[in-house]
Amino acid sequence: MITDTQLTLLSNTLGATIFLLIVYYHYVATKTVTAAKKDN
């Protein structure tokens, strides 16, 4: 079975990864919108 320590490490790693992906997504989406406005 999975121990409490392993579960804690897994959940913290997944949470941090998802958080960073969301921040990266917002950065890319904002940069794309800004670039599209400059082209017009």
Swiss-Prot record:
Mode of membrane association: Single-pass type III membrane protein
This protein's UniProt keywords: Endoplasmic reticulum, Membrane, Signal-anchor, Transmembrane, Transmembrane helix
Cytoplasmic side: 30-40
Matches recorded under InterPro entries: Oligosaccaryltransferase, Ost4p_sf
Record Pfam families: Ost4
Transmembrane stretches, start-end: 7-29
GO CC terms of this entry: oligosaccharyltransferase complex
UniProt GO BP: protein N-linked glycosylation
Location(s), subcellular: Endoplasmic reticulum membrane
Listed pathway(s): Protein modification; protein glycosylation
Lumenal side stretches: 1-6
Family per similarity comment: Belongs to the OST4 family.
Subunit structure: Component of the oligosaccharyltransferase (OST) complex.
Protein task: Subunit of the oligosaccharyl transferase (OST) complex that catalyzes the initial transfer of a defined glycan (Glc(3)Man(9)GlcNAc(2) in eukaryotes) from the lipid carrier dolichol-pyrophosphate to an asparagine residue within an Asn-X-Ser/Thr consensus motif in nascent polypeptide chains, the first step in protein N-glycosylation. N-glycosylation occurs cotranslationally and the complex associates with the Sec61 complex at the channel-forming translocon complex that mediates protein translocation across the endoplasmic reticulum (ER). All subunits are required for a maximal enzyme activity.
Protein known as: Dolichyl-diphosphooligosaccharide--protein glycosyltransferase subunit 4
Natural source organism: Dictyostelium discoideum
